[in-house]
Each structure stands twice: as C-alpha cells, then as structure tokens.
Amino acid sequence: MATTWQGVNNAITDIVEGPISPRVNEPIGPGRMHIKVDEIVARKGPAPWIELCIEDERNLGTLIASAPGQGNRAHWHSNFDEWWVVMGGKLRWELTGGKIIHAVKGDIVWIPRGTVHHIVTEGDEMSLRFAVAMPPAVHVWQDECENCDVTWEPEKPA
C-alpha cells in the first residue's frame, strides 16, 4: 500500500540508499551543519538584516531580524508552503481574508501556498525569526496589504 510520503520520495531524485557521511559542512555560508545564532546576531548588529543559513536543492533557511514597526512587503508563493520559528520579539502575520496571527518567541507559524502574507514586528524590540522555504522561493509581490493601511510602490520590471 503506497502512502503520500512514498509519492513524495518518488518525486525526489537525490535519495540516498542507507547511512552516509555528511555531504556538506562548510565553515561559512549556507552548508554549515551547526549554526550559532548568537554569533550571527552579534556580527550583524541592529536590525534590519537577513542571513541565509541553509541552501540546497530542497531547502532554504533564512534568519531574519526586523526593527520595531518594520515589516516585509505583502506576497504569496504558488509552489511551496512557508513556515517560521519565532526566536525573539513579537511578530504579526496579516493574511488573506483578514486573518491575523500574533506570535512570540518559541512559536511556529505555517502559511500554506497561495496565502498572501505580510509580517510586521510589534512592540519595542527587534524580532528574530527563522524562515523555512523551498528553492527557488519565488515571491509574488502585492501592492497593498488588505488588513492594514500599508501600501508599497508597484514593482517595476527589471
């Protein structure tokens, strides 16, 4: 009897047959097997900043720091779900249909593909979140957030 998980495995071409030694362990950049978040925060300093921590053919892991009141542009993804681990501060996710999620350190937020989302740091301290996505992580940008009064200039063709 096949499961949906077997179907997923059949779609992945890079499957190993048994235990192997780690294939990557870069000293810097994506490919590090052990990432010390405190060291990144100390090196990067005050928000805003991002640090790409994990990148391979199936995974993108990005550490994101935002200043109080700061947010990203509303967007959605057509081919992957996105999720975050809140590591510091308070964040607000504003979603399609008027749904709002408030999250704090220790929370995990998962947003299904197709859902417009816009993330804002609440309170008076920097927020820190670890975002997990699937490459190439294409963003479909929106000109406004339907839940708040934030608007952005329309994207100009490159």
What is each model feature region?
Residues 51-55, 63-64, 72-78, 95, ...:
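Short histidine-centered beta-strand/loop micro-motifs
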Residues 57-59, 80, 126:
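Short acidic/glycine-enriched loop/turn segments that link adjacent beta-strands
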Residues 64, 83, 106-107, 117-119:
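Hydrophobic/aromatic beta-strand elements that line small-molecule binding cavities or substrate pockets
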